[in-house]
Swiss-Prot record:
Catalytic class of the enzyme: isomerase
GO cellular component terms given for this protein: cytosol
UniProtKB keywords: Cytoplasm, Gluconeogenesis, Glycolysis, Isomerase
Main location: cytoplasm
EC code(s) of this entry: 5.3.1.9
Record has Cytoplasm as a keyword: yes
Matching PANTHER family: GLUCOSE-6-PHOSPHATE ISOMERASE
Function comment: Catalyzes the reversible isomerization of glucose-6-phosphate to fructose-6-phosphate.
Name of the protein described by the UniProt record: Glucose-6-phosphate isomerase
Length: 540
């Protein structure tokens, strides 16, 4: 049965027509806000996070029908299949067991294998952090360079930045991902080879960007005096292809394993997170895993009506497929979460930016929305104008941390006030009559410019403090949200075939950039002209 033919989908279409013009302002009006209040009814805790869904354009009937849609689409069955280690990535014939990486049950899939690899990580991380692992001249490691791209970069970078307040001050962690040499060059300006450890992270150990940077970094070490037989003091590899790591020149003892049943964008919990463990320590890394496990248990055990990943995913579908929203915004009011929007861009769009259903037919409805964002309050001075007064509705996830992780506590009330005020302003808006009063006498022409449509939907996620545990729960919340949406849309969130064609053609174009001549029939006229211009520039 296709999505459009599910009874709950049909019922939601009728329900949407009934409430599409309803005003949140009216739903919050005192005469309508009974006990329990709307905020109390639509605020749900889970995994150390409280989610306030009350400023969304939903009522009790909306949630009831959305939850029925989840049941009709088989969300519970697919969730259970994923946790059990069944093949939920059919195009690649794989399980998706990122949840096993943080499971505490000894009966969980691959528990012994995971525990052994984590113990190896912990031993190494402690040696680096304590200074017993040294560089080739005997100096302690003070810089770690993580070289990877996509899931081998975005997750670790986001977490290390977020947990700076619990990281060791003895070691600075750098992240290099782009094949643009400027990325690596700028990091190399800051580090001393005698005190630098490189972590090369690639599932296949053949990724173009990662291996290009890794080779350049190896050459840099040698050029600055590191003997080739001492490179083992400065290079470790993380991969599902250990043989290729050794072939590159990294000692077998310096190889940490990841597995093909963990997708790259879900892999920070594995050895891909080695840079995280070195930064914050094995004990805090365990707390990160524990927080994710808290959310895993909530996702498995909470009824769908009170299940944060389920509701977050379903409300996203409500706006994407019924209101026609093209994008949604993630606005963490926390500078520590600066890289969370970038991380979620990959998690959501690489997972659910698909057009083919699981059976190979093509969807006739939208799937992943464009995910974007910026920390508050920066975004208020950049794009919030459009959110408040533009004609396009952009649903927003606000994320607020109630207690600061830094010593400048006097800043924090201002930060929280802005977050909460933005959600209220987006919901309330300002009518033309109200705008006339604000404009004042004799300024009637200004009033339309001072109106705000309001009725703009937002969800606010609250955590008491940003700790490894609450961060782990927050990340897992969005991981499971992705699965919920993929299940309803009947797509595979665990593959990424969309990245392949460009990579294949990229190799052809790269060869043409250094060729003596180009066959004009090989490319379209635009691509040929671009190559010719670049060839001329590269020869200068």
């Amino acid at each position: 049965m296709t999505l459009n033919s599910l009874p709950a989908w049909t019922a939601l279409q009728s329900h949407f027509e009934q409430i599409r013009h309803a005003r949140l302002r009216d739903w919050f009006a005192p005469e309508n806000d009974h006990t329990p209040t709307r905020a109390e009814r639509f605020t749900i805790p889970g995994g150390g996070i409280a989610a306030d869904f009350s400023k969304n354009r939903i009522n009790d009937d909306t949630l009831r029908l959305l939850v029925q849609l989840a049941r009709d689409a088989g969300v519970e069955a697919r969730r259970d299949a994923m946790f059990a280690g069944e093949i939920v990535n059919p195009t690649e014939g794989r399980a998706a067991l990122h949840t096993a990486l943080r499971a505490t049950d000894p009966q969980a899939p691959f528990h012994a294998q995971i525990s052994a690899e984590r113990a190896k990580m912990a031993t190494f991380a402690r040696a680096v952090r304590s200074g017993t692992w040294t560089g080739y001249t005997g100096k302690r490691i003070r810089h770690v360079i993580n070289i990877g791209i996509g899931g081998s970069d975005l997750g670790p970078k986001m977490v290390v930045h977020a947990l700076h307040h619990v990281a060791t001050p003895e070691i600075t962690t750098h992240f290099v991902s782009n094949v643009d040499g400027a990325d690596l060059a700028r990091v190399l300006e800051q580090v001393d080879p005698e005190e630098t450890l490189a972590i090369i992270v690639s599932k296949t150990f053949t990724t173009l960007e990662t291996m290009t940077n890794a080779r350049s970094l190896r050459d840099w070490f040698v050029a600055r005096g590191c003997p080739e037989d001492a490179l083992a003091k400065h290079f470790v590899g993380v991969s599902a292809n250990p043989a290729e790591v050794v072939k590159f020149g990294i000692a077998a003892d310096n190889v940490f394993e990841m597995w093909d049943w963990v997708g790259g964008r879900y892999s920070l919990w594995s050895a891909v997170g080695l840079s995280i463990m070195i930064a914050i320590g094995p004990e805090q890394f365990d707390e990160l895993l524990a927080g994710a496990n808290d959310m895993d248990r909530h996702f498995r055990e909470a009824p769908l009506e009170r299940n944060l990943p389920v509701l977050l995913g379903l409300i996203g579908i409500w706006y994407r497929n019924f209101f026609g929203s093209q994008s949604y915004l993630v606005a963490p009011y926390s500078e520590a979460l600066h890289y969370l929007p970038s991380y979620l861009q990959q998690l959501e769009m690489e997972s659910n930016g698909k057009s083919a259903r699981l059976d190979g037919t093509f969807v006739d409805y939208p799937t992943s929305a464009v995910t974007w964002g910026e920390p508050g309050t920066n975004g208020q001075h950049a794009f919030f104008q459009m959110l408040h007064q533009g004609p396009t509705i952009v649903p927003i996830d606000f994320i607020a941390v109630l207690t600061p992780e830094h010593p400048l506590a006097s800043h924090h009330p201002k930060l929280l006030a802005n977050c909460f005020a933005q959600s209220e302003a987006l919901m309330l808006g300002r009518t033309l009559d109200e705008a006339r009063k604000v404009a004042g006498p004799g300024k009637e022409a200004l009033a339309p410019h001072l109106t705000f449509p309001g009725n703009r939907p937002t969800t606010t996620l609250l955590v008491d403090a940003l700790t490894p545990r609450t961060l782990g729960a927050l990340i897992a919340l969005y991981e499971h949200k992705v699965l919920v949406q993929a299940t309803v849309w009947d797509i595979n969130p665990f593959d990424q075939w969309g990245v392949e064609l460009g990579k294949i053609l990229g190799k052809v174009v790269e060869a043409d950039l250094s060729a003596e001549s180009i066959d004009p029939a090989k490319h379209d006229s635009s691509t040929t002209a671009l190559i010719e211009r670049a060839r001329a520039a590269l020869k200068r």
